[in-house]
Amino acid sequence: YKGSKNINKVLTEENVKGTVFLVGFNAFTKDLKQYVEDYKQNPNGEIANHTYSHAHNKYKAFYSMPEGVYEDIRKNEVVLDIHSRWVRLPARNTWRLGNKKKDDPVKNSIPAADLLAKNQFFIYGWDYEWERSSKKSKTHELSSPQNIYNGIVYRLDQNKTYEKNHLVILMHDDMFNDDHNAEKLRQL
């Protein structure tokens, strides 16, 4: 989880804004709790909700009980002291922003997203994902910042984003555990 520390460092040193969607279950050690506190102290960072459990990576069962998803979100608010109403659902590119909505191709998150929206949560998906060069890579080498930048510009130019002239990029903190990949984040 050194990636969280590296992300926070880049937000501070480069004076850029970022929103981090946190999973409460992951904040169980002294170091991880400190990373959460460091994000809270950073004026460039916004903390948002990515559920307490991350569905324990059992998404079909998780989304089959919308009320359970809602309770998991509420638990994360308490555990991490999250005040934002922004949520990203685990493993689903689902959006609920005001009257606008977009559903993930895997439709099983729709009832949960609708319930959360009804309770004044704003659900964010993503427009673009920064992935590893190869999912099977042992080095976890990331796509180059230039390739990511080109993808961002293309999506904005072609209006291939959820909201015009606004892009949400999905990254995971473990991508930046090593300093080499953290430097790629800085370059972007």
Where do the language-model regions lie?
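Catalytic grooves of carbohydrate-active enzymes
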Residues: 145, 149-188
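Boundary/entry segment of secreted carbohydrate-active catalytic domains
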Residues: 1-6
